[in-house]
Amino acid sequence: MRALITGITGFVGSHLAEMILRDHPEWEIHGTKRWRSPRQNLVDIEESITLHDCDLTDLSSLIRVLDEVKPDRIFHLAAQSYVMMSYRAPTATIDTNVNGTINLFEAIRTLGQDPLIHACSSSEVYGQVRDEDIPIKEDTPFRPASPYAVSKVGEDMAGYMYHHAYGLRIIRTRMFTHSGARRGEVFVDSSFARQVARIEAGIQEPVLRVGNLDSVRTFADVKDVCRAYWLLLEKCPPGEVYNIGGEATMTIGEMLDMLLDMTDLKDQIQVKVDPALLRPADVTNQVPASDKFKAATGWRPAVPYSQTLRDMLEYWRSNVVANSTTERDQ
């Protein structure tokens, strides 16, 4: 049996590959990557998986990879996933996330394949939700507040349409905030952890730059997310959509306080709002209702968010030390 992970070099993709290799060794793991994709997230498993160069915006390259792999399951995780970047590059974000997803579905149709497909959308599709709609359910209206969110609405609806029009066995998720070691430095809790590690190493002044600390998020650990994605294709019927989220709900400021409690330099670090980190249109309240998914799969988050934060901080401490010669401020 073969699983194909698009975006395997990324944060969740690499963790998912590790989990499948460890817990489901009967599965053969294939992954797509761009030719320029960094591969450090795969350093411990690269010899145990098969990588394929592939550009989601190039239909012919997807047809080539799918024809070679003939996957039984596809975890479609590849995306331009940074909200702030989407404001700077909206066309590229739409091209990668919407057109890339449609190309994947078209390649499957062209080849007449019938894999189970996980199409990974985002809680960002819901945008700024009214207080009376918290916690957010799957039937909450879309109010996308960024080009990234618009692209994920497009991906989500493409998954819906390709299932109902063509019978592709697509199951959609709208994933809420998730974190852990290897999380990209542009994302809020990972950015904070990286800054703390740099301050501890003496290569950043003791000023921690932040955006909006009042926004509310519900955090999940990447290891719990990977379990959820596997259970999704094990237990859930094609055509359905599920919110998936953790249970650690707090403001960004409360999350920062938890992180600062993990460093001996807490009292020396100044927190400073950086206007460059503020979104043009913020989404301030993201609390999921994951009841539908939990009922279908029996899934529950297992990793405390304090451990998630500690994992991120230790990751950045190791990374900063290993790259200290290039990390120093000019």
Question: Where do the protein language model's features map onto the residues?
Answer:
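Amphipathic terminal alpha-helices
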Residues: 11, 23, 27, 305-330
